[in-house]
Amino acid sequence: MNPETLFDFPEAKGIVISGDIHGEFNKLVFKCCVQYGMTDTVIIVAGDCGFGFEQQGYYENVYNRNRGRLSKSNNWILFVRGNHDNPAYYIELPIKHRRWMTVPDYSVVRACGHEILCVGGAISVDRSHRMNHSAYNLPKQDEPLARNIYWANEYPVFDADKLDAISEDFAIDTIITHTAPSFCELTSKGGLFAEMAIRDEDLTEDVKNERQVMDRILDYLTSNHHPLRYWFYGHFHQSWQAIDNEGIQYNMLDIMELKELGAKD
């Protein structure tokens, strides 16, 4: 497995997963480090972090503003890719600060006895609106981090080769994604989705495919005997939890909702 997609935290004493933060980086750091007084904790944001809506320097300034607080608390923040994140921050030019890093798809986080698979991406149901907005810019190859409001390569991808490589070295017990398997909430296709599907004729099929990618990842992990017990995701801006017949607990996290992943038994 590529060492750049292994994130190892032997010092960590806790793991917390956050729902979407939509650019509220300062609020997340304050909530974790000050409001809840977390220490020695790996904090993983399940997508829609907000990378790409501002210039690159903005995110460096945010990090510089918060790194002292993170260091003092001995906390680390990892950012999984959502549909509202420029994939270039995860592929071509990932952020690699000691306590603040973007996590490429099919990375493994190892902490507190857990081996956690992270796979980002989802479909923006309002993509047609975003592409017609004056703030939308066609991507330029020589400016991968240029400010924008939509990225066409936002969708999740099933990669059997990467899963095979992961299976050689790890036993995945937890997965963090942005979207979710097809049987998880939300399953309703009303509201904004129904409105946007009228204008975007491919939306229904693309969202179906997005959820099926998650189904395929689940099928792979279970059929290859990974000890999967927890699945965390964001994207839908609501909170929900359920346990399936195999004992896997699915956790949908609302915006800025935090949930602790306990130490492995």
Feature names for model-found ranges:
Residues 35-39, 167-170, 225:
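Glycine-rich phosphate-binding loop signature in dinucleotide/nucleotide-binding domains
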Residues 114-212:
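Active-site-proximal loop/helix segment associated with metal-binding centers of metalloenzymes
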Residues 11-16:
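Extreme N-terminal starter segment of soluble prokaryotic enzymes
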Residues 18, 23-112, 207-211:
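Core catalytic region of metal-dependent phosphoesterases/phosphodiesterases
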Residues 24-26, 52-54, 86-90, 109-112, ...:
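Short catalytic/ligand-binding loop motif for oxyanion handling, primarily in non-cytosolic enzymes
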Residues 1-8:
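A short, compositionally biased domain-edge/stem linker segment
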Residues 17-19, 43-48, 76-84, 102-104, ...:
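Active-site neighborhood of phospho(di)ester-bond hydrolases with catalytic His/Asp-centered motifs
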Residues 9, 110-112, 216-224, 236-265:
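Binuclear metal-dependent phosphoesterase catalytic core
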